[in-house]
Design a protein with these regions (language model features):
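N-terminal glycine-/serine-/threonine-rich phosphate-binding loop
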Residues: 1-6
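Internal active-site segments that recognize and position negatively charged phosphoryl groups
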Residues: 56-58, 83-150
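A glycine- and small-aliphatic-rich helix-loop capping segment at beta-alpha/alpha-beta transitions
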Residues: 14, 20-32, 117-123, 155-162
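Glycine-rich beta-strand-to-loop/alpha-helix junction loops that act as flexible
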Residues: 8-12
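Ligand-binding beta-strand-loop-alpha-helix segment within the catalytic cores
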Residues: 20-108
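Polyanion-binding loop/helix "lid" in catalytic or ligand-binding cores
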Residues: 38-59, 105-127, 157-179
Length: 179
């Protein structure tokens, strides 16, 4: 079967730690001081570069498996954050057949006064899965974790660990980026 694949990977320690340290999810914080040598603007550049480095590792891993791939870093084509971010999703639709398109959560430019923010891979996935034609599967692959929580930690005492997801399983929750 001829299947087109879009791979959306997370940031892990390449992006999350510095983004949290410099409060990048909040956007520009006037007059804020940080426990580190960088300004917020310098941290934006650093996190973008760190994400490009991680993305290069992903592309190299695919290449070693003889999988052709191309990268679309969100800071190069998307603006604003959340599920209503602005960006040309046709870049994914129009990618050459047989090429895996790789993207990731990223620090993107935002309207004033925020100036920048975190566009999460979760928001990218929602838009790609619902707006691109012919999408019939969304697969989450995770490593090094015990499973998926039914709700974010601390939101509800009724949250439970889902050790194995199946196609007949349904749960509902809300996710927010806390960086």
């Amino acid at each position: 079967e001829d299947i087109d694949v879009i791979l959306v990977h997370g940031a892990g320690s390449f992006g999350h730690l510095k983004a949290k340290q410099y409060r990048l999810a909040e956007g520009h914080v006037e007059g804020a001081t940080f426990d580190g040598p960088l300004t917020q603007d310098e941290a934006v550049t650093d996190v973008r570069n760190d994400m490009l480095a991680l993305n290069e590792h992903v592309l190299n891993a695919l290449t070693r498996l003889d999988i052709s791939a191309v990268s679309l870093a969100p800071h190069q084509w998307a603006r604003n954050t959340g599920p209503s971010f602005e960006g040309d999703l046709s870049l994914f639709r129009d990618a050459p057949k047989g090429i895996v398109v790789v993207t990731h959560g990223d620090v993107v430019d935002c309207d004033e006064p925020k100036r920048f923010g975190i566009l999460s891979g979760d928001d990218l996935v929602v838009r790609l899965a619902t707006e691109l034609p012919g999408v019939n599967r969304l697969v989450f692959a995770m490593g090094g974790v015990e499973g998926v929580l039914s709700q974010p930690p601390g939101v509800s005492s009724e949250a439970y660990l889902i050790e194995r997801l199946t196609e007949n399983m349904f749960f509902e929750g809300e996710h927010a980026v806390e960086m």
